[in-house]
UniProtKB/Swiss-Prot annotation:
It comes from Homo sapiens. Changing R748P: Found in a lung cancer sample. It is found in: Cell membrane; Endoplasmic reticulum membrane; Golgi apparatus membrane; Nucleus membrane. The chain crosses the membrane at residues 646-668. Changing E734K: Found in a lung cancer sample. This is Epidermal growth factor receptor. Changing G719S: Found in a lung cancer sample; somatic mutation; strongly increased kinase activity; constitutively activated kinase with higher levels of basal autophosphorylation; more sensitive to gefitinib than wild-type. Changing T790M: Found in a lung cancer sample; increased kinase activity. The modification Phosphothreonine is found at T678, T693, T1041. Residues 688-704 are annotated as: Important for dimerization, phosphorylation and activation. Changing P694A: Strongly reduced phosphorylation. The modification Omega-N-methylarginine is found at R1199.
Length: 1210
């Protein structure tokens, strides 16, 4: 059936419309786009002209569309042609009222502005709050990737009505930033016909076209209506006119003529008949989002069929059949380096002292090169030093730049651009300001010196403001340009007449095409002939060395085997066969240095020749198998070959060497056997082989308890890390009815041998100490996974304790803690132990009146002759360390004194961080400049001066721990004189009773037999029965029936055993532990118990009432009592170690915190120590009282690493 006339005419009209459209799609005008962001290019006029040049008649922008700094009354109508932007669209800092992006359909968002936005409209207003009013992007229907940002556009109308979820992908809606302000001017409302009142401006034509949110559920992408039959093909973007892939307004991925496709047609197809890849006649290259038959000029083709600006690292660029292609390198490629702004130089503005080394041996630069004034000044903000001019020679290997070359600064003492003397081609695939591929501005040079430059493929040239520059106007630039549209802008340089007056003109040997400088090697081309790169008057044809011949106006050296002729040519061409006369011998047509002798010839036969009197080589007789000296058999050598005798001699020498080697080996083995037998005999006879070298050091007689796994019970996990797990539990010694709260540290199954060694080293140190103020090891269990059993400190670390109770801590507590820490450190010094990690976090609180030093993971035991310890590395607490420890890794007892001063400062500031806000890498420099921690508000100058003495640069000038004990003991007797705390006399700390406390702590009901570890290890009178079945030895045994009975000191055998050790059960409620100490009495273990508190110091009249409830309670009750006896509200802190001034309080659940109970876990530098690892435990305390232990944000602990890192070497 024939179609009607009307239908046929319509069909012809449709075909006529489609054909031009198809051609138009293939021939769309493409432009590169810009990446200037908010940079202004010159004046407003220059900036606008640059924008106009880049986007005039442009339809597809391959990069970014940046419209910035456009002033009022500028005509932006050239932007109407833009339909597609591959990168982002930035509209910022404009005062023009209307930006007509009326035909923009899609923003692909292949690049983002500020890492998030595909469309950014920012600050388009002037001082009068007038500016951008209309942004009619009525055809914008899709943004494939990226979010949208509007900010500070007070005059912009109607945009707030747009339904962006129809345009932006749902993946990016959460990143949208919309700041629409109240309009100062009047805005016309949207046309009533607009759907949901959404429009880009007044009038029906500016209504928003919805192609997504109105679609039926059956549609997977865009649509042209609400019906299921209106769905667009899934290859369409921004809408469609029909259901097919050829009906798309814009293609989502690639456009092949009028059809949208997922990929472009491949260049090669597999032929199943021939089992080979054949050329696809329909194959096309992918260029942006378009399939093209041929890549645009100045682009290269990859093996994958893409048009790219530069080849990859494993390929090189070459021209084949008129097409520039990327070919895989055979072996190593010539070195291609990224340019400024790409890859590792993404954030660099210029070549500088820190990045120029990356250009070493580079032959091709993929991108641009900038040399700006900041390179030679240095940049204090980025800590970049000034560039050494000598390092510019690194760039002499560069032969190609794919982008542009910008030079705005150069060394004053260099007269030309010497670093680019080998540069051959500037491709200009990216241009400065979208225009220039070579820019040399404001330099002090006299000549360019680009003597190897042969091509500038694209882009203009600007050479301006170089007051001493000559020769630039002599160059025939058009011969270097790749296109006819390229231009030069050579202005404001030295005048031509001034150059001639000083003789700065091209050399006489240069041709009229100009020169790059004054030397013959600077000529663009030579007037006569050239030798290498240098122009010469003539070649060495008849005289001179070396002799040459002429080829294409170039002097070529004759072959070395050509004999120089007098007043005649030496050779006629290249190679040894073009010589007029040979220098040595003639072998056929060739000149050779010697006649062939034993050279492999045809049929695997050796060729031998001799030279006649005329120095001509002839073949030897066939029977002369080892050469000859003349023709015939008589020319053969009579002595026979020399090779067999040489071979025989070599074999004999090798056999002789072998025999000698065997003899030496047997002799050495015999000596070893004799020595071994002698050593065995001496050992059997128990004779000393070496002389005695006694050290004079006392033997370490510390006891190490080996516990069985059945003797302790794990109750609850305190924490875990890389080393293993820490439990709180009970130690129940075999055969004894006591329970001792302990912390159990268990290594993992797969723990490394190094971790096992380190934990045993720590066990050695902890087992070697025995002092009331040093945390000790109770025992070790050698199961398949090593387990350490240590004391359980109820109140956690002192740092957290002072932070939590800062409102209840009085001066007496603070000074007593200082005394106790000094006592513990003095004990460690006497035991030759350097702690290396003293800080408030490493002091544990047994009771509010009793603290102990812990964390021996870094402690080192000095030998008998050692005065200091040199560390090799690892994490160290920089902000607590002495200066010599930071700089030279030297640790002594006096470096511990420095740490003690910082620890005291922590206590006096109630847990403040030392040097807070100062990076650890800068601590050494500020200490060397004399800066120290400030005086805490509560400290008098007496206390602060002690801290300052601890921080002296000279280690010998710091006080000893013995002296610190005396100083702080004196202050502890009159605390309110030295520490000023508001409400000091009303402050008190909780001190729960043992049974209730441990029951709450251990979550156990049956805690009647609970005993503190110290009391078990040093038992008092009648405390235990110590049956004979106990396998755990006790030091002594005492018995006390009551507090008011007469006490006898009795050992296990029933004998009187006195005196009582310090901090013993009987002295638990003794007076001030500091006592009336002198330097001579510091080390006395047994001190007499004073009858009254602070009896050596007059009592303060106000607020200093002492609590005698348990202090020095007499063995027989006195008839009269102090009026404050058993006063629960007394504020006395007379006994600095053991106070019980308040009723028992509930145990805070903070005791479940691993940070408080884990005893610092294993002190290896690993996850097991929270002070050395961030985010190991949660930080905050919940309102219900359950405490989540704070992780140590210890930037103070740094491992050896580069300066840019948070870790620095110990």
């Amino acid at each position: 059936m024939r179609p009607s006339g009307t239908a046929g005419a319509a069909l012809l009209a449709l075909l006529a419309a489609l054909c031009p459209a198809s051609r138009a799609l293939e021939e769309k005008k493409v432009c590169q786009g810009t990446s200037n962001k908010l940079t202004q290019l010159g004046t407003f006029e220059d900036h606008f002209l640059s924008l106009q040049r880049m986007f005039n008649n442009c339809e597809v922008v391959l990069g970014n569309l940046e419209i910035t700094y456009v002033q009022r009354n500028y005509d932006l109508s050239f932007l109407k042609t833009i339909q597609e932007v591959a990168g982002y669209v930035l509209i910022a800092l404009n005062t023009v009222e209307r930006i007509p992006l009326e035909n923009l359909q899609i923003i692909r968002g292949n690049m983002y502005y500020e890492n998030s936005y595909a469309l950014a409209v920012l600050s388009n207003y002037d001082a009068n709050k007038t500016g951008l009013k209309e942004l009619p992007m009525r055809n914008l229907q899709e943004i494939l990737h990226g979010a949208v940002r509007f900010s500070n556009n007070p005059a912009l109308c109607n945009v707030e009505s747009i339904q962006w979820r129809d345009i932006v992908s749902s993946d990016f809606l959460s990143n949208m930033s919309m700041d629409f302000q109240n309009h100062l001017g009047s805005c016309q409302k949207c046309d009533p016909s607009c759907p949901n009142g959404s429009c880009w401006g007044a009038g029906e034509e500016n209504c928003q076209k919805l192609t997504k949110i109105i679609c039926a559920q059956q549609c997977s992408g865009r649509c042209r209506g609400k019906s299921p039959s209106d769905c667009c093909h899934n290859q369409c973007a921004a809408g469609c006119t029909g259901p097919r892939e050829s009906d798309c307004l814009v293609c989502r991925k690639f456009r092949d003529e009028a059809t949208c496709k997922d990929t472009c047609p491949p260049l090669m197809l597999y032929n199943p008949t021939t089992y080979q890849m054949d050329v696809n006649p329909e194959g096309k290259y992918s260029f942006g989002a378009t399939c093209v038959k041929k890549c645009p000029r100045n682009y290269v083709v990859t093996d994958h069929g893409s048009c790219v600006r530069a080849c990859g690292a494993d390929s090189y660029e070459m021209e084949e059949d008129g097409v520039r292609k990327c070919k895989k390198c055979e072996g190593p490629c010539r070195k291609v380096c990224n340019g400024i702004g790409i890859g590792e130089f993404k954030d660099s503005l210029s070549i500088n002292a820190t990045n120029i080394k990356h250009f070493k041996n580079c032959t091709s630069i993929s991108g641009d090169l900038h040399i700006l004034p900041v390179a030679f000044r240095g940049d204090s903000f980025t800590h970049t030093p000034p560039l050494d001019p000598q390092e510019l020679d690194i760039l002499k290997t560069v032969k190609e730049i794919t982008g542009f070359l910008l030079i705005q600064a150069w060394p004053e003492n260099r007269t030309d651009l010497h670093a680019f003397e080998n540069l051959e081609i500037i491709r200009g695939r990216t241009k400065q300001h979208g225009q220039f591929s070579l820019a040399v501005v404001s330099l002090n040079i006299t000549s360019l010196g680009l003597r190897s430059l042969k091509e500038i493929s694209d882009g203009d040239v600007i050479i301006s403001g170089n007051k001493n520059l000559c020769y630039a106007n002599t160059i025939n630039w058009k011969k270097l340009f790749g296109t006819s549209g390229q231009k030069t802008k050579i202005i404001s340089n030295r005048g031509e007449n001034s150059c001639k007056a000083t003789g700065q003109v091209c050399h006489a040997l240069c041709s009229p095409e100009g020169c790059w400088g004054p030397e013959p090697r600077d000529c663009v081309s030579c007037r006569n002939v050239s030798r290498g790169r240098e122009c010469v008057d003539k070649c060495n044809l008849l005289e001179g060395e070396p002799r040459e011949f002429v080829e294409n106006s170039e002097c070529i050296q004759c072959h070395p085997e050509c004999l120089p002729q007098a007043m005649n040519i030496t050779c006629t061409g290249r190679g040894p066969d073009n010589c007029i006369q040979c220098a040595h011998y003639i072998d056929g047509p060739h000149c050779v240095k010697t006649c062939p002798a034993g050279v492999m010839g045809e049929n695997n036969t050796l060729v031998w020749k001799y030279a006649d009197a005329g120095h001509v080589c002839h073949l030897c007789h066939p029977n002369c198998t080892y050469g000859c000296t003349g023709p015939g058999l008589e020319g053969c050598p009579t002595n026979g070959p020399k090779i067999p005798s040489i071979a025989t001699g070599m074999v004999g020498a090798l056999l002789l060497l072998l025999v000698v080697a065997l003899g030496i080996g047997l002799f050495m083995r015999r000596r070893h056997i004799v020595r071994k037998r002698t050593l065995r005999r001496l050992l059997q006879e128990r004779e000393l082989v070496e002389p005695l070298t006694p050290s004079g050091e006392a033997p370490n007689q510390a006891l190490l308890r080996i516990l069985k796994e059945t003797e302790f019970k794990k109750i609850k996990v305190l924490g875990s890390g890389a080393f293993g797990t820490v439990y709180k539990g009970l130690w129940i010694p075999e055969g004894e009815k006591v329970k001792i709260p302990v912390a159990i540290k268990e290594l993992r199954e797969a723990t490394s041998p190094k971790a096992n060694k380190e934990i045993l080293d720590e066990a050695y140190v902890m087992a070697s100490v025995d002092n009331p103020h040093v945390c000790r090891l109770l025992g070790i269990c050698l199961t398949s996974t090593v387990q350490l059993i240590t004391q359980l400190m109820p109140f956690g670390c002192l740092l957290d304790y002072v932070r939590e109770h800062k409102d209840n801590i009085g001066s007496q507590y603070l000074l007593n803690w200082c005394v106790q820490i000094a006592k513990g450190m003095n004990y460690l010094e006497d035991r030759r132990l350097v702690h290396r990690d003293l800080a408030a976090r490493n002091v544990l609180v047994k009771t509010p009146q009793h603290v102990k030093i812990t964390d021996f993971g870094l402690a080192k035991l000095l030998g008998a002759e050692e005065k200091e310890y040199h560390a090799e590395g690892g994490k160290v607490p920089i902000k607590w360390m002495a200066l010599e420890s930071i700089l030279h890794r030297i640790y002594t007892h006096q470096s511990d004194v420095w740490s003690y001063g910082v620890t005291v400062w922590e206590l006096m500031t109630f847990g403040s961080k030392p040097y807070d806000g100062i990076p650890a890498s800068e601590i050494s420099s500020i200490l060397e400049k004399g800066e120290r921690l400030p005086q805490p508000p509560i400290c008098t100058i007496d206390v602060y001066m002690i801290m300052v003495k601890c921080w002296m640069i000279d280690a010998d000038s710091r006080p000893k721990f013995r002296e610190l004990i005396i100083e702080f003991s004196k202050m502890a007797r009159d605390p309110q004189r030295y520490l000023v705390i508001q409400g000091d006399e009303r402050m008190h700390l909780p001190s729960p009773t043992d049974s209730n406390f441990y029951r709450a702590l251990m979550d156990e009901e049956d805690m009647d037999d609970v005993v503190d570890a110290d009391e078990y290890l040093i038992p008092q009178q009648g405390f235990f029965s110590s049956p004979s079945t106990s396998r755990t030895p006790l030091l002594s045994s005492l018995s006390a029936t009551s507090n008011n009975s007469t006490v006898a000191c009795i050992d296990r055998n029933g004998l009187q055993s006195c005196p009582i050790k310090e901090d013993s059960f009987l002295q638990r409620y003794s007076s001030d532990p500091t006592g009336a100490l002198t330097e001579d009495s510091i080390d006395d273990t047994f001190l007499p118990v004073p009858e009254y508190i602070n009896q050596s110091v007059p009592k303060r009249p106000a607020g200093s009432v002492q609590n005698p409830v348990y202090h020095n309670q007499p063995l027989n009750p006195a008839p009269s009592r102090d009026p404050h006896y058993q006063d629960p509200h007394s504020t006395a802190v007379g006994n600095p170690e053991y106070l019980n001034t308040v009723q028992p309080t509930c145990v805070n659940s903070t005791f479940d915190s691993p940070a408080h109970w884990a005893q610092k876990g294993s002190h290896q530098i690993s996850l097991d120590n929270p002070d050395y690892q961030q985010d190991f435990f949660p930080k905050e305390a919940k309102p219900n009282g359950i405490f989540k232990g704070s992780t140590a944000e210890n930037a103070e602990y740094l491992r050896v690493a580069p300066q840019s890192s948070e870790f620095i070497g110990a």
